[in-house]
């Protein structure tokens, strides 16, 4: 009798791609979508319902694309993470993009609060935490004194949270400046990833402070203008297309990819559930025989049927 492979652990509550691979959690391989997402357009907005894998896909993109800033050209971390996954079969794409890009990746989920003051504060905290990932740029010989001074402002939590005109100016310019700093240091235009871009606006609309919030968010998103010389690609995810009051004023010719568009990128598909989960998952997670496979397959289909 052939010995059965040990069951993989099913993990919920984490959206970090690297943890799935590092700790051996069960992972449905969707890395074949990295190239369609990356090649779609210089400015791409992906719209999907909640729990559709958007955040995990953005995490996967970051781990695939982001270069080793200490050792540019070293892709050993990516080689280990993506070994045996579908994207590794696309050698041309991997050689051109795996570990080759500076990346700025941020989620605006925490900025969805019930009052303007709390939303703005959480947005400021999000920017502060993001900026701390790039504190090492203070030692870059390629940045001028003005750029380093602005970076110090981004690292000043009290300044960001203060809420006056100076504070708003730093907050609104934060993404543009982080991209500029990385561009000047690395000599490569970074990829900008914004997850849950619409979350603070949804809460603002529901709680009647949309006009206040849009005055902060609109300048923040000016980084996405195609005239911006400091980013190569901008990829956003969310549930809704926020068009009220011109949030994307000046941003022309960007691509929207939703479940209604003909060129949609299927982050979840019926055949993924049918074959990827109901077949592969049962064998790897611990199913035994066709009866168990049918039972788990039926449960998977029932859970995902609203999205087929």
Q: Where do the PLM segments sit?
A:
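Positively charged, low-complexity/disordered segments
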Residues: 291-308
């Amino acid at each position: 009798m052939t010995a059965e492979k040990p069951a993989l652990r099913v993990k919920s509550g984490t959206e970090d791609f690297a943890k799935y691979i590092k700790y051996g959690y069960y992972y449905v391989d969707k890395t074949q979508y990295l190239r369609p997402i990356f090649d779609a357009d210089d400015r791409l907005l992906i719209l999907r319902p909640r729990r559709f894998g958007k955040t995990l896909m953005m995490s996967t993109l970051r781990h695939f694309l982001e270069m080793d800033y200490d050792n540019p050209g070293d892709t050993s971390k990516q080689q280990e993470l993506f070994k045996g996954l579908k994207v590794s079969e696309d050698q041309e794409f991997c050689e051109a993009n795996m570990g080759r890009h500076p990346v700025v990746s941020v989620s605006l989920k925490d900025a969805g609060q019930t009052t303007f003051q709390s939303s703005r504060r959480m947005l400021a905290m999000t920017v502060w935490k993001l900026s701390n990932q790039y504190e090492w740029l203070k030692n870059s010989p390629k940045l001028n004194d003005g750029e380093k001074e602005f970076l110090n402002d981004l690292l000043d939590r009290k300044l960001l949270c203060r809420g006056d005109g100076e504070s708003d100016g730093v907050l609104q310019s934060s993404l543009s400046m982080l991209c500029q700093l990385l561009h000047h240091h690395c000599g490569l235009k970074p990829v900008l990833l914004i997850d849950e871009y619409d979350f603070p606006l949804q809460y603002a609309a529901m709680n009647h402070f949309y006009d206040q919030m849009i005055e902060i968010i609109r300048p923040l998103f000016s980084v996405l203008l195609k005239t911006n010389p400091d980013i190569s690609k901008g990829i956003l995810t969310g549930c809704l297309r926020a068009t009220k009051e011109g949030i994307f004023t000046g941003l022309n010719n960007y691509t929207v990819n939703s479940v209604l568009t003909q060129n949609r990128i299927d982050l979840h598909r019926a055949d993924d559930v049918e074959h990827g989960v109901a077949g592969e998952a049962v064998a790897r997670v611990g199913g035994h025989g066709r009866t168990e496979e049918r039972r788990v397959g039926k449960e998977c289909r029932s859970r995902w049927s609203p999205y087929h």
